[in-house]
Curated annotation (Swiss-Prot):
GO MF, any single term: peptidyl-prolyl cis-trans isomerase activity
Protein name: Peptidyl-prolyl isomerase CWC27
Keyword set, alphabetical order: Cytoplasm, Isomerase, mRNA processing, mRNA splicing, Nucleus, Rotamase, Spliceosome
Provenance organism: Gibberella zeae (strain ATCC MYA-4620 / CBS 123657 / FGSC 9075 / NRRL 31084 / PH-1) (Wheat head blight fungus)
Gene field: CWC27
The enzyme's E.C. designation: 5.2.1.8
Length: 548
């Protein structure tokens, strides 16, 4: 590993990628891959990668991200007027032939270096469209050696420190093999830049360009509305199209509530401006004053009956309100209605609730309060039923008494008859017994056990009920308990000292050598015994002196 670090150049930039599965400390080679590193750092500074996911995972190969759409088909570089280009429009195709632009006029070129290879896990590379010079905002991390990517994708960074284990955990997630999409994708929360070698880099924000034509049209519309105020009056002959709407706003909503019958009237009032606009568009050469007069002429025959309908409406509404002075349904907001629907849905899903009437809660004891709310109560057994414990106990006692009475009435055990037949001393008696025995047709053997019906024998043996009166008896196990047996076992054990055995073998060899030289073995033994007796006598004399 140290050799790999010695071969790779020194990194000149550093960032920390904060994800939902931990941090990733990344070092960038901005000197060897300036275009790729500038693109990555600028997008990270602008917040382009915030809240994006790693949309592709190939276990043992790569973990890919950097697409704001999360599909793998999006993403753009800073060199082609992307999302954070400000007021600038995307570059025309005839102007995308600079040093940073690729041959197709989009993205930017690849940057390969002889000292940057995909030879281990934790390396950062730039994803492309499987074609040269098509790099964008997408990037990937290697999960293992990927030699096939050398010369195809730009390597511009590596993971430093123990954060590579966070990457290994991300690579062990569940994935859909068909789409290579993680089941639970990891999200990039933000990217923190620690070291930025590009001093001229500044954070950019996306600014939406405002079209001046739209503002002029809105101003013209406002001016037309202001000009219509001079026609506001409570007369029956003349009035603006918006007069009924303004008149309704003057009513106090706490006293007069909108009735559902006025909905079609409002639709007709709102549809009038659309009709007037169509007429104005068809008559472009007519002056504004003439258009207003025409509109007034068209609306005058329709307005009087509408106003007559609206005037008697308030007393009718008051009568309705007298019957129900406190309407609660219209005052409820959308949030309150949603909460009520959720509460009703939860109530319908419960098994214990059978009616909508409120049930008074009983005070729970200390033991019942410890039972969780999600627990289900078991069914109580009916007393006296056949499946109760009392009935089972009584049945078991009856069976036990019946078995005990059967043991008492059992016959005594039969004594085992000797299997071998006693033969007489005379051969004639033995021969007579053999003649009386039946010979088998297959082996010609008297009382052949192989040819007898074994099933009948087992049946006869099974019919014997003497086992009920049989008593179990075993021989006393005295091994290890009786002191005499223990001492006998100790005496039988033979302990051999290898040093004593070696000494004995040495003496035997010496005796054999002396015997060959002329000295008898018996004389040697006598000399050895004499020396031993002399030592013992000397020791006894010394012990006797001490005793006195």
């Amino acid at each position: 590993m140290s050799a790999i670090y010695n071969l790779e150049p020194q990194p000149t930039a550093s960032v920390i990628i904060h994800t939902t599965r931990g941090e990733l400390s990344v070092e960038l080679f901005a000197k060897q891959a300036p275009l790729t590193c500038r693109n990555f750092l600028q997008l990270a500074l602008d917040g382009y990668y915030d809240n994006t996911i790693f949309h592709r995972l190939v276990p043992g190969f790569i973990l890919q991200g950097g697409d704001p759409t999360g599909t793998g088909n999006g993403g753009e570089s800073i060199y082609d007027g992307g999302a954070f280009s400000g007021d600038l429009d995307p570059w025309p195709m005839d102007q995308r032939m600079g040093k940073n632009a690729g041959p197709t006029g989009i993205n930017f070129k690849d940057e390969f270096h002889s000292r940057l290879k995909f030879n281990r896990r934790g390396l950062l590379g730039s994803a492309n469209e499987s074609r040269p010079d098509t790099n964008s905002s997408q990037f990937f991390f290697t999960l293992d050696t990927a030699e096939e990517l050398n010369g195809k994708n730009t390597m511009f960074g590596r993971i430093a420190g123990d954060t590579v284990y966070n990457l290994a955990k991300m690579g062990e997630g569940e994935v859909d093999e068909a789409t290579e999409r993680p089941t639970y994708p990891v999200k990039i929360e933000r990217i923190e830049i620690l070291i930025n070698p590009f001093e001229d880099m500044k954070k950019r924000s996306r600014v939406a360009a405002v079209a001046p034509s739209k503002t002029t049209t809105t101003k013209d519309k406002k001016k037309k509305r202001k000009g219509g105020k001079q026609l506001l009056s409570f007369g029956d002959d003349e009035g603006d199209d918006e007069m009924p709407v303004l008149k309704k706003k003057k009513f106090d909503p706490r006293i007069v509530m909108e009735a559902p019958e006025e909905a079609p009237e409002q639709d007709e009032v709102r549809s009038k401006p659309t009709k007037a606009k169509k007429e104005r568009a068809s008559e472009k050469r007519v002056s504004i004053a003439q258009e207003e007069q025409d509109n007034s002429d068209q609306t005058t025959p329709r307005e009087p009956p509408k106003e007559v309908r609206q005037k008697p409406a308030p007393p009718v509404k008051m009568e309705i309100e007298d019957e129900s002075p406190e309407p609660e349904a219209p005052r409820k907001t959308a949030l309150e209605r949603a909460n009520e629907e959720m509460a009703a849905l939860k109530a319908s899903m419960r098994r214990t609730i059978h009616s909508e009437e409120p049930v008074k809660e009983k005070k729970k004891s200390a033991l019942e309060s410890m039972i969780p709310e999600t627990s289900m109560r078991g069914r109580k057994r009916r007393p006296g039923a056949a499946n109760t414990s009392a009935a089972d106990d009584a049945k078991a006692l009856r069976m036990l008494k019946a078995f005990q009475s059967r043991l008492e009435k059992a016959p005594p055990e039969k004594e085992n008859e000797p299997a071998a037949r006693e033969t007489t001393k005379d051969g004639e008696d033995a021969q007579a017994g053999d003649e009386e025995a039946e010979l088998c047709d297959l082996h010609f053997i008297a009382n052949c056990q192989s040819c007898t019906s074994w099933d009948k024998q087992e049946k006869d043996e099974s019919d014997d009920e003497g086992w009920m009166s049989h008593a179990l008896s075993f021989a006393a196990d005295k091994l290890g308990k009786d002191l005499s047996n223990r001492r006998k076992a100790e005496e039988e054990l033979v302990v051999i000292d290898p040093r004593e055995k070696a000494r004995t073998l040495k003496d035997e060899k010496k005796a054999a050598r002396d015997a060959r030289q002329g000295n008898s073995g018996r004389a040697w033994d006598q000399a050895r015994d004499a020396a031993r007796n002399a030592k013992m006598a000397q020791a006894a004399s010394l012990a006797g002196r001490g005793a006195k």
